[in-house]
Each structure stands twice: as C-alpha cells, then as structure tokens.
Amino acid sequence: MSAKKKVSSSKAINLGEAKLQASGIDVKLAKQLGLHYLDGQQTQKLHKVFKPLCSLKIDYFDVAGKPLADLPRAKSFYRLRYLETPTDFQSLTDKKPVRYVQEPNTAPVAYYPKNIDWEELVVDADKPLLITEGELKAVKACQEGFPTVGLGGVYNWRSHRLGIEWLPSLGVVTWAKRNVYI
C-alpha cells in the first residue's frame, strides 16, 4: 500500500502561483522545475526552525537534473520562500522579515534551473553564462533564453563557516575564457 502524499491547501497554491506569476514564471512549469507549494503545517514539518507559514519549496538539482546535496552524504538540498508575512512577536520589529530560509548547518549550493539543458552548456566556454541572486530570477532568465545560475545570496558562492572557498556545485562549470555576467 502506498503512502498518500498530503495535498497543499488552496491558500498555499494560490499564494505560490501568485508569487510565480509576479516573477513572470510560467506556473505550469512549477512541478518540472522542482517548485512545490506548501501550507504552514507542511512547511514546519520539514524542520522545527521553519515558521508555520505557506511557502514555496525550491528543490536544487545538479547540471544533469538530479537532486543535489550541499555536502557529501547529505540529503537533497532545498530552500524555502515564505509566501506569507509572519505575525509573531518578532515580526513587530522594524526589521524586514526573512523571506528565504534553509535548514540550519547546510552549505550554500548553486541553483541550476531545470528549464535549461546544463550538461553541454557548463563545459562549452564559448557560451556565455549569467549569475544572479535568487532562484526565481534564475528561473525567469532561463525561461527567457538566458542561461542563468542562481545563488541564494550575494555571498552564497562560498561558506567561510564551513571552510568552503568555492562551491563544488560551481566547480562543474568551465569558467576560463567564458563571458560571465553577474
């Protein structure tokens, strides 16, 4: 007997589709891209540090389209984009609420959107490559024909805390003599 997968609430789906549409992303491609709409309960179930808010789960893949881990023998990497604004005590401050989160003690990973064929592109230095902050911006750029690697933040090409000076997931790209736009 197979386990039933819980279906996200209509609220999570509506918020997720609205976010993708606002980013100019074709919502019909969400599943193919590894984007999943989660309700608050599903979000919090992933890890105890996550707030019980609707979110967009962004799965990461290597250049071959296989799930990507941040470190050897680790589980598949993902990040969350909260789709709601927190209403807890901490949210009453003037600080901008955190929108993107990942599990504690995970390393940054390069995001290769699945709407581009990366395997040939990463080894062909004659083809230009773009790098941007944000997975959704990378998806949109690839959707428009601009091969773009996404980073979860402007410094997410390394992790001093984990002793990573250059992400292994970026090491698969032939960088020498390639035009790169950031």
Task: State each model region's role.
Residues 1-60:
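Short, small/acidic-rich helices and loops at N termini and domain boundaries
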Residues 45-178:
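Phosphate-handling DNA/RNA-contact segment within nucleic-acid enzymes
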